[in-house]
Amino acid sequence: MEIFIEVFSHFLLQLTELTLNMCLELPTGSLEKSLMISSQVLQIPVANSTKQR
């Protein structure tokens, strides 16, 4: 479980950096869209991991 948390937090960090880098190049209106997309992407692996247990 701890390994999963480390991997997940590392993935979250990379995703946040990627989102911020994208937002610097895009207009501010797309910031909300990219945040919505990233939150949807994060919900999928969490749901899958709970089903596997």
Curated annotation (Swiss-Prot):
It comes from the Eukaryota. Highly expressed in dendritic cells and primary leukemia cells, especially those of myeloid lineage. ACC-6 expression is limited to cells of the hematopoietic lineage. Disulfide bonds: none annotated. One of its GO terms (biological process) is positive regulation of type II interferon production. This splice variant of HMSD is the precursor of the histocompatibility antigen ACC-6. More generally, minor histocompatibility antigens (mHags) refer to immunogenic peptide which, when complexed with MHC, can generate an immune response after recognition by specific T-cells. The peptides are derived from polymorphic intracellular proteins, which are cleaved by normal pathways of antigen processing. ACC-6 forms a complex with MHC HLA-B*4403. This is Minor histocompatibility protein HMSD variant form. The lineage of its organism: Eukaryota, Metazoa, Chordata, Craniata, Vertebrata.
